[in-house]
Amino acid sequence: MTVDPIHQFEIKRYVDLLNFGGVQFSFTNAALFMFGIVAIIFFFLTFATRGRTLVPGRAQSAAEMSYEFIAKMVRDSAGSEGMVFFPLVFSLFTFVLVSNVVGLIPYTFTVTAHLIVTAAMALLVIGTVIVYGFVRHGTHFLHLFVPSGVPAFLLPFLVVIEVVSFLSRPISLSLRLFANMLAGHIALKVFAFFVVGLASAGVVGWFGATLPFFMIVALYALELLVAMLQAYVFAVLTSIYLNDAIHPGH
C-alpha cells in the first residue's frame, strides 16, 4: 500500500465554467466545501436566532456566546470604534473555525490547508486596514510607519523596518493557519496508514497497531484544539491589525 498523505489536499475539478484569457475557471471540491461551510454557518445562525427567548436554548446560547466572544475580542483589541469591523472579524472567525472542524471529518476537504485560501483572507484583512486607514486619516495613516520619540538619524532605518513588518503581516497570517492545518492532517494520515498496514499483518499486527491507533485518537483531540486555537489566533491578529487603521499613531 502506497502512503500518500498529500492526496487529501488535491483540488478536483467538477464542472468547467469558462475560459477567460487562457485561464480556466472551474467549480472544484474546494469551492463546493467553501459554499457548504458558508451554508452551515448561515443556517445555524438563522436557526439559532429565530424565535429568540429570554431563556435561551442551546443553539441560541451558542450563537450569543459566539457573538459576545468576538465582540469582546474586538473591543479589547481596537476599542469601541473597532466594532465597525465586527462583521468582518466574526465572519472570518466562524469561517476558519467551521472549515478547520469540518476538515477533521474523514473524507472531507480542508480548505484552510490551502495557501491560496488563507492568503486571500489575509490580503482581505490587510487591504481593509490600508483602505480604511487612508479613507479615515488620509496621509496621517502613514504615521503608522513613523515611531515617535526616536532620534532623527535612526528614523529612516526604523521606517524601513516598520514597512517591512507591515508587509509581512499577510504572509505570517496566512502561513500560520495553512502550515498548522497541513501538518496536522498529514500526521493524522500517516498514523492512519500505520494502523491499516499493521492490522493487515494478522494477530501480531493488531497488537502492533494498538499504539498508533491511540496516537491517532490523541492527535485528533490535539487537532480539534488546534482547529479552535487557530481560528482564535486569526481573529485576534485581525482585530489587532484593524486597530492600526483606527489608531495609526504609535
Swiss-Prot record:
InterPro entries the record matches: ATP_synth_F0_asu, ATP_synth_F0_asu_AS, ATP_synth_F0_asu_bact/mt, F0_ATP_A_sf
Matches recorded under PROSITE patterns: ATPASE_A
Transmembrane intervals: 27-47, 85-105, 115-135, 141-161, 181-201, 223-243
Superkingdom as given in the UniProt entry: Bacteria
Gene3D superfamilies the UniProt entry points to: ATP synthase, F0 complex, subunit A
A GO-annotated cellular component: plasma membrane
Record carries keyword Cell membrane: yes
Keyword tags: ATP synthesis, Cell inner membrane, Cell membrane, CF(0), Hydrogen ion transport, Ion transport, Membrane, Transmembrane, Transmembrane helix, Transport
Subcellular location, record wording: Cell inner membrane
Residues making up the signal peptide according to the UniProt record: none
Presence of keyword Transmembrane helix: yes
Pfam family membership, one: ATP-synt_A
GO molecular function: proton-transporting ATP synthase activity, rotational mechanism
Topology within the bilayer: Multi-pass membrane protein
Main function: Key component of the proton channel; it plays a direct role in the translocation of protons across the membrane.
Assembly with partners or alone: F-type ATPases have 2 components, CF(1) - the catalytic core - and CF(0) - the membrane proton channel. CF(1) has five subunits: alpha(3), beta(3), gamma(1), delta(1), epsilon(1). CF(0) has three main subunits: a(1), b(2) and c(9-12). The alpha and beta chains form an alternating ring which encloses part of the gamma chain. CF(1) is attached to CF(0) by a central stalk formed by the gamma and epsilon chains, while a peripheral stalk is formed by the delta and b chains.
Name assigned to this protein: ATP synthase subunit a
Source species of the chain: Xanthobacter autotrophicus (strain ATCC BAA-1158 / Py2)
Gene behind this protein: atpB
